[in-house]
Amino acid sequence: MNSNYLFILILAPFLLVSCSEKPKESIIETQENKTVETSIKATLEYKIKAQLGEGAFWNYKTQEFYWVDIEGKQLHIYDPATKTNRSFPTPSRVGTVVPQTDSTAVIALEDGIYIINTQNGNITLLSEVEKEMTVNRFNDGKCDPNGNLWVGSMHLDQTAHMGSVYKISETGTTTKMIDSVTISNGLVWTKDATTFYYIDTPTGKIQAYDYDSQTATISNERTAVTISEEIGFPDGMAIDAEDMLWVGLWNGNAVARFNPKTGEMISKIEVPAHNVTACAFGGENLDKLYITTASVDMTQEESAKYPLAGSLFVAVPGVKGVRSNFFSSKK
């Protein structure tokens, strides 16, 4: 999301609880998600001024962090071991990235889905889905347990209900899975591959669906979590080994952990950026959380307060993640 994609919203004042460099427990209450929570502070991992960092994905095979700058029109591959970041320009806004092989990844551009060579940046068309929808672009996307890419579209001017979520196979077969969405975001599956969670940001909700791994279809939609506007707007999402949900909070300076069974907020990671967009568990043991942020949609005061906005951050949340699914025809 960026300034072109938010509705005019009036946020109630929200006071972040300060904490030291080490994890520190605190009690924070909100209207909907009342709970005692552990608050942790994220630290700077890589300084960069991305306009709209998104698409967080940890490649466990290469131990690299894949991410995109949507408005900057770049795919990034960051290596924490060397603190280096490789960048590939894209011909239009790039909404998400998921690795396919050691040298290829699937990316979502404005006019369709492409395979990019992560050695030389060359791209090849896979699906022309929504090519005729020139007022739309693609946003967040992830792969299901069967290896299909699920990616959502949105209107460039955030007109409500103009987007859809599509399932795209490695051969390019495209199926519409969800329609009438506004700002398509966070997509994750539980480790037993029976539940799919999804975010349409302006709703302030995380929706749950039953997932059938035999047919790669969803059913039985219901609301798992309702997020108060006081803490921000739900953006990208990751899932941990306990099937708890980690959500980047746009306008919220944080990543929050939610229990989808109870709807409660369990913990929070404070991030020194106003707009937190996405996160992914990484590291050799999947015990670190890498976080993307945006440098757009801030007042002058907010820009001065968060000079590192747009950078990558990292935190140690105290729980481990799970390996994310690659784009592949193999389960």
Predicted regions, residues:
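Short loop/turn segments immediately following beta-strands, especially the blade-tip
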Residues: Y209-T217, V316-V322
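Hydrophobic alpha-helical segments and helix pairs
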Residues: I123-D179
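Bacterial signal peptide processing site
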Residues: S20-K22
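A short loop-to-beta-strand structural motif that recurs across blades of beta-propeller domains
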Residues: Q74-H76, G112-Y114, G163-Y166, K205-Q207, ...
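A short helix->beta-strand "capping" segment at the edge of beta-propeller domains
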Residues: T30-A50, Y78-K83, P89, S127-E128, ...
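Beta-rich, blade/repeat-based domains predominating
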Residues: I48-T62, P91-L109, E132-N148, M177-T195, ...
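C-terminal motif of bacterial Sec signal peptides marking the signal peptidase cleavage site
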Residues: L15-S18
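Conserved beta-strand positions in repeat-built beta-propeller and related beta-rich domains
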Residues: N59-Y60, F65-I70, V106-D111, L149-T159, ...
